[in-house]
């Protein structure tokens, strides 16, 4: 599992990016967020996640808010 910080997240569109120190930003889709109810992330929020290979490159999976 990697740890990072939410760089930005557009709740209306349901996606954003997670910043990982020393690495490229990782795409995150709302469907990858592990929580019940409304799935969204806040800018600057610390998260833990796995990286999987998506259709357009690396993306976050199993995202957990810290």
Curated annotation (Swiss-Prot):
Pfam families tied to this protein: CSD
Domain of life, per lineage: Bacteria
Subcellular location: Cytoplasm
Domain CSD as annotated: residue spans: 1-66
InterPro entries: Cold_shock_CspA, Cold_shock_domain, CSD, CSD_CS, CSP_DNA-bd, NA-bd_OB-fold
Keyword Cytoplasm part of the UniProt annotation: yes
Keyword Chloroplast: no
SMART domains named among the record's database cross-references: CSP
GO cellular component terms given for this protein: cytoplasm
Keywords for the protein's UniProt record, in alphabetical order: Cytoplasm
GO biological process: one example: regulation of gene expression
GO molecular function: nucleic acid binding
Signals that turn on the gene: Up-regulated in response to low temperature.
Function of the protein: Involved in cold stress response and in the susceptibility to an antimicrobial peptide of human cathepsin G (CG117-136). Regulates yellowish-orange pigment production through a still unclear SigB-dependent mechanism.
Name under which the protein is recorded: Cold shock protein CspA
């Amino acid at each position: 599992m990697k740890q990072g910080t939410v760089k930005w997240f557009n709740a209306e569109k349901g996606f954003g990016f997670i910043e990982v120190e020393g690495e490229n930003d990782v795409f995150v889709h709302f469907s990858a967020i592990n929580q019940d109810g409304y799935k969204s992330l806040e800018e600057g929020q610390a998260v833990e996640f796995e990286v999987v290979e998506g259709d357009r490159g690396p993306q976050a999976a199993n995202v957990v808010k810290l």
